[in-house]
C-alpha cells in the first residue's frame, strides 16, 4: 500500500467525520484525532507494526513478512525506510524495533533458538547488546533522549516478566501486586510517568507508575477485556488500545482517569502505539487481515474535565481476553505489539 497522504487530505475536507475521531464524551470543538497518512514497509504482504515516534517524526517498528519472519525498521520523517534491522544474534527470524529517541537511537529485542528474548541498542548501524544482569530474558521497550530506558525481564526462565526502568544507570524493577507479568513500555523525558500493562491471569490491564514510584492500576475503560498502554509524551498524553465486544479500539488516555477512543475508518482493529510532543501519533489498523501503519495528529486541546459515567475506569474484574486472535492484530506474540 502506498502513502495515502494526498487522498486522505482530500477526503478529510469532503468527509470530515470518517477520518477525524472526536474525543469521546466531549464537544467536537475541544479536540480530535486526524489521520495524516498510511504506510507499509516495502514488499508484498508485509504486516507493518509501528511502535514509537520521536520529535523528528521518525517511526520505529517491525514488519512481519508472509513467511512469519519479523524484522525491525525505521520510517524516517521524509517517508523513506531503513534497511531491515536484524540483530546479528537473531537466528530464528525475530527482531523488533521498539523505541526511538531524537538521536535516532533505537531500542529493541530479538529471539534465539532456545526461545528466549534478548535486547539491543542500535545507532548508526551499530548494535550494542543488552541484557539485565543475571536474568534469562530481557525485553527493551523504549529509550528517551537522556538514554534512560524501560522494558521487562524474566529473572529465572519462568516466562514471568518484571517491569524495569533504568535512569542515569540505576535500574529499578517492579511488578503490579498480584499480577503475573508486568511490562514497562515507555518513560517520558521528564521521567514523570512510566506506562505499560500487566497480566492478571489471561487478562491484560493498563497501569502507570508516577514520579514517586506509585503504581496506579487497573487502567481500563469500562467494558474493556484487554487494555495496553504503549506510549506517552512529555505532556503526559498516553496512547494504547483496548478490546471490547470483539472490536479493538485505539485509546487516548489522560491520567488519572480520562479515556478517549479512536477507530481507523472501516477497521475493527486500531492500535495507537506512540505519540510525540507535537501530538503526532503512530499506530496501525487491520484491513482484510493485513496490518498497515498510519500517522495521525491530535487537533485542538484534549479535554481535561471528568468523563461521562460510561467511560469511567473499570474497577470490576475484566472478562476473559481473546488470546492472540491473529498475527495482524497482536503480532502472534507477547509482550504485546
Regions found by a protein language model. Give the residues of each.
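Bacterial N-terminal signal peptides that target proteins for export
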Residues: 1-10
